[in-house]
Amino acid sequence: MELLPHEKQVVEYEKTIAEFKEKNKKNSLLSSSEIQKLERRLDKLKEKIYSDLTPWERVQICRHPSRPRSVNYIEGMCEEFVELCGDRTFRDDPAVVGGLAKIQGQRFMLIGQEKGCDTASRVHRNFGMLCPEGFRKALRLAKMAEKFGLPIVFLVDTPGAFPGLTAEERGQGWAIANNLFQLARLKTPIIVLVIGEGCSGGALGMAIGDVIAMLEHSYYSVISPEGCASILWKDPKKNSEAAAMLKMHGEDLKQFAIVDVVIKEPVGGAHHDPAAVYRNVQNFILQEWLRLKDLSIEDLLEKRYQKFRTIGLYETSSESGPEA
C-alpha cells in the first residue's frame, strides 16, 4: 500500500510491534502486557495524527490509490447488481457505472462515477472524467428509475468533467446543465454520496438529490486545490493554502448547508478498512430510504427545491450593515 507522508511514523511503529511479536514467539523478549502497552501507544499516536490533519492531507487521503471506488462499493454492498450501459445517443461512457442493485432486499438504481484502480483501468475509465455521454447515461438510468418507482443512489468520485475538445463538441456544458434541470424535478427519491473527489461540474451533474452526504475525508468543491492555486497565485505548489481556503470538506460544507450528512471513516481513511465503510454507507442508504419513502411526491419535490434554493442564501443584521 502506498504511504502518505503523515502515515510513515504510524507504519514504522506498527512494524516495530510486529517484529517484537515475531521475536517473542522464540525468545519472549517482552511480556504480553508490555506488547499491549505498545499497542495502546500506537492507538494514541494514530488518534493524535489523524485528529489533526490539514485540509491538504485529507485531500491526499481522498486521492489514495487504494481508496475504494464505486465498483468496490457495488461489490461490497449489493446482493445483486445488473449493469446497464450506453446513453442511447452516442456511446457508453466507462467513467460511469450504473445499474439495478439490491441492498438488503431493497431495490435501487445505483449510479457511480468510476476512476479505475490501476493504469489500464484508469485509462479505460478516463480517470473518472465524464464525457457528455456519461451524463446522458446517468440521466437515462435515473429516468428509468423514475418510471419503475426505484430510489436512486449516486456515488460521486471525479476530478471533474472531461475538458477535451471532443467533449465540448458533443455538448459537455449542456449535458451537465440538463442533468441539473432534469434531476431537480425527478419524481423519485435521490440519495447522493460523495465517496472521493467531488470536483466542479463533473460532480454537480450527478449530485442533485434529496439528501447529500460525504465521507469524512472526501471533498466537494468548485475546483481542485491545484487549479485554485494556479488561478489565485499562479503557483500550483500553493495547493495546501488553497485546500484550506476552499472549505471543501464535510464539516465546513455541512455548516453551509451544502451537505446534510458526514459519514465517519476508519482511522486513517476508507482504504484502511473498506468493509467497515461499506457497512456504514449501506446503513446510511437504507436509513435515508426509510425516511424519504414516506414523503409524497409533492413534498419530496418541494423539499428538494427548497434545499437547493436556499444554498448560498445568508441573512445579515441590519445593524451590521452600512447606514442609510
Swiss-Prot record:
Please give the subunit comment from the record: Acetyl-CoA carboxylase is a heterohexamer composed of biotin carboxyl carrier protein (AccB), biotin carboxylase (AccC) and two subunits each of ACCase subunit alpha (AccA) and ACCase subunit beta (AccD).
> What is the designated name of this protein?
Acetyl-coenzyme A carboxylase carboxyl transferase subunit alpha
Give the function comment from the record.
Answer: Component of the acetyl coenzyme A carboxylase (ACC) complex. First, biotin carboxylase catalyzes the carboxylation of biotin on its carrier protein (BCCP) and then the CO(2) group is transferred by the carboxyltransferase to acetyl-CoA to form malonyl-CoA.
Concerning Pfam families, the annotation shows: ACCA (PF03255)
Q: What is its EC number?
A: 2.1.3.15
Q: Which family does it belong to?
A: Belongs to the AccA family.
Gene name on record? accA
Q: Where in the cell is it found?
A: Cytoplasm
